[in-house]
Amino acid sequence: MAKLSKDRLIFGLFLIVLIAIGEIVLTKLKLAAWPAFMIMIFFFEAHMDTKKAANILLGGLFGIANLILIKMFLDAAAPSLGLDLAKLVYILVFVYLIVALGEVVPILFNNYCFMFFLVAGLAAMTPAPNVFQWMAVEIVGGGLFIAGILCIMKILGAMAAKKAVKT
């Protein structure tokens, strides 16, 4: 069984402060918090690899933006195909493009794109959805969360270096 790590406990304290600040600011501004927090979760899932940050941010942004594209497609295709079939066609093409172009344009066509499209689609069913707001929160808030996490890591690194000098 693993032991409690002092570094993880300290990281956790800094992280909950970051989360609280993010939640308070977004709530005060009456902005949806979920896009920024999804970025945070995916950044952790990517083991805080800064090389994946652009794929997470831009893939997520593209996923949310697809709500605009599907609306345009449905407006054009639903009269002839019916709403359900038009929606299915769009989703099938969207998933196919993620698979087909995932290695060609991985910054946009990736799993983050698909997950943000799915969650944004569900969020769009709530009262007063605001896709453009979600996109802004995803990029700005998510980017700030990534920066905050990296800042926490630097602080912990500096603390460890200071401790190493003392011993």
Role assignments for model-derived ranges:
Residues 10-22, 54, 58-70, 86-98, ...:
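Hydrophobic faces of alpha-helical transmembrane segments in multi-pass integral membrane proteins
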Residues 30-47, 95-128:
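Pore- and pathway-forming membrane helices of multi-pass small-molecule/ion transporters and channels
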